[in-house]
Amino acid sequence: MKSSIINNSQKIDKLFKGVVSHNRSGKIEHNFNNKIISILLDLKSNNTNLPMFFSTNRFNVLSWSASDHGLRVKNSNKNDLYKFIINLTSKLGFKNKEIRSIKLLTFPKIFGYGFNPLSVYFCYNTQNILI
């Protein structure tokens, strides 16, 4: 993805532009290069500096909904998703107090339609190191 470096010291959401490429060879060849937009969300922060064409949990040109992730509970929010990830990491042996922040890199919906083949969660410890 082409954008600025992800800086964990900032507790703001970020929008990224990039390209997804695919190339299949063999009997049936296929390839594509598609432009994409992704967003990095700090699940513990309510602060945002996103443009007015982006909304959380409601329709807009670009939007994101917590209910599309985690337990997929209607009317859930970032905090619910944060708790879901804390629960998953505790099953892996991490203690809640070891995790300082959780960020989600995902694809937003465009005019209410979404295609999200991949969501990545970044968990940072109390020393601000990715774990």
Q: Could you tell me what each predicted segment is?
A:
Residues 1-131:
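Mature, function-bearing regions of proteins
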